[in-house]
Amino acid sequence: MNCSELLPPASVRGMRELQRAEFQKRVQVPQLRVPEQQVQRVIPLVKKFLLKMEHMHPVRAVDKSREILLHPMPIKAWESLPTEDLQKQQVTQENFSFVELELNYENWSANEILKSVLPEEEEGMTSYSRIGHIVHLNLRDHLLPYKQLIGEVLRDKLPNCRTVVNKASSIDNTYRNFQLELICGEAEYQVETKENGIPFEFDFSKVYWNPRLSTEHERIVKLLQPGDVLYDVFAGVGPFSVPAAKKRCHVLANDLNPVSFHWLQHNAKRNKCLSNIKMSNKDGREFILKELRADLLQRLRLTDTSSYATHITMNLPAMAVEFLDAFRGLYTDNELADISDAVVFPTVHVYSFAKGENTKALVRAQVEQNLASTLDEKQLQGISFVRNVAPNKDMYRVSFKLTRHLLTTSKEAEANNVRKRCAEDEKVDPEVAATKVKCV
């Protein structure tokens, strides 16, 4: 008997409308029939051969005996079993036989059902995300004709799944949240979920939340100690800010999306950390130029920055690097004149996508271009791979230290300095040098 006989019927291939009754089939499987009192001694001997399928117990009561169902792939005959050990328990070939089973839709997992239905020559459904009671898909074009069936199978098979949605388009709106298509279940998008042990609540249809970033959120939060400072420029519903505030860090969190801002406040209150967090609802650049600027200046002037760490998170990978120039010339020389040279400036963690061959080099170039500055070894704290987003498209975190020079020199002033240096090197008039490409 071939193991393929335990798979769903071949006739369901290509099914687009879920017909559960079509999955019925009858198969022959090996079994041992033993007296009830012997079961506890026999099971350990055949445990690795037990037939394990959804909603099917491998040991069935029949009168005063027990039928132990075995997997037909390794067990072709009595001789396939550990016969000597079984005979010591008074189990012989007479206890061995084949029995007919009726399998149906309930006996296969979601993965087994979908593999049997979806086109064999195309890539199947590789993954999905769980957010509370919602299952979030990102189906490729060739699977769209099967989306209704896929949704029904997942709702049937996944515990506590009530809503299945598909990503309807790329994230291109102002607030960077997913555009969703309901393909099965309830149009109920308010969810409760936990990330790294912390509860969050939000409307998934109106905010951005990606459970695949939970490990990255945890990495950053682990860097923080009580008393540290976190400026979260694109805070969303709080996956960085709320855990940091719970650790008794001083947090300034911001998000442009008013719905995200609402749930950020809700999650801070729910997690009882409101006393450690200040929240704002504005553009990230405005937040940097106002709230972050004022709070950081006060800390640089009035506190011992060597006694705590300051971090700035910028998790908006599609465009966060475009906000880095806001740090250039954030302060005047006079504002930082009385600050000790021993001051410890913040570490920025900026996230970005890069597409191409050497994505790590590309993402560094993006950061340096937007900063209008090369990051030396002392400044650059690391470039960390976060996840693969698509073929040849990766997400990275670039961590670097801000410096007095960056914070007091605007991009324009930096460009002028570069042009002057070029002019001096080439011993030509600065205005002439400024027209040359290599001096820009």
Curated annotation (Swiss-Prot):
Its EC number is 2.1.1.228. The keyword DNA damage does not apply. Keywords: Cytoplasm, Methyltransferase, Mitochondrion, Nucleus, S-adenosyl-L-methionine, Transferase, tRNA processing. One of its GO terms (molecular function) is tRNA (guanine(37)-N1)-methyltransferase activity. It is an enzyme of class 2 (transferase). It is found in: Mitochondrion matrix; Nucleus; Cytoplasm. It catalyses: guanosine(37) in tRNA + S-adenosyl-L-methionine = N(1)-methylguanosine(37) in tRNA + S-adenosyl-L-homocysteine + H(+). Gene3D superfamilies: Met-10+ protein-like domains (3.30.300.110), Vaccinia Virus protein VP39 (3.40.50.150). GO terms for cellular component: mitochondrial matrix; nucleus. InterPro entries: MeTrfase_TRM5/TYW2 (IPR030382), SAM-dependent_MTases_sf (IPR029063), TRM5-TYW2-like_MTfase (IPR056743), TRM5/TYW2-like_N (IPR056744), tRNA_Gua_MeTrfase_euk (IPR025792). Its main location: mitochondrion. It comes from the Eukaryota. S-adenosyl-L-methionine binds at H217, D255, L256, D283, G284, N315. The keyword Transport does not apply. One of its GO terms (biological process) is tRNA N1-guanine methylation. Specifically methylates the N1 position of guanosine-37 in various cytoplasmic and mitochondrial tRNAs. Methylation is not dependent on the nature of the nucleoside 5' of the target nucleoside. This is the first step in the biosynthesis of wybutosine (yW), a modified base adjacent to the anticodon of tRNAs and required for accurate decoding. Monomer. Belongs to the class I-like SAM-binding methyltransferase superfamily. TRM5/TYW2 family. This is tRNA (guanine(37)-N(1))-methyltransferase. It comes from Drosophila pseudoobscura pseudoobscura. The lineage of its organism: Eukaryota, Metazoa, Ecdysozoa, Arthropoda, Hexapoda.
